[in-house]
Amino acid sequence: MNKLTYIQEIVLKCINKYYEENGEAPTLSELCEMAGINTKSTIHWHLRNLQKKGYIRVIPKLKRGIRFINNN
């Protein structure tokens, strides 16, 4: 897997924390708030890059459609 940027690490940790606390993925709005990012387009950009790097899968048009990819 490719190395993560500092912000990508924060976004990934926020997703993981939300999963642990709630048993489901955060919405984009919740993720923006948790990561301290102002716009959904910026979150989309980071999610797209995390997906390209093989850390997550984003299911289009699904409200809580962020899934971790198991790469053991």
Task: Identify the function of each model-found stretch.
Residues 5, 22, 61-72:
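Short, cationic-aromatic polyanion-contact patches
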Residues 17, 48-49:
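Alpha-helical DNA-recognition elements
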Residues 51-59:
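A short, conserved structural fragment
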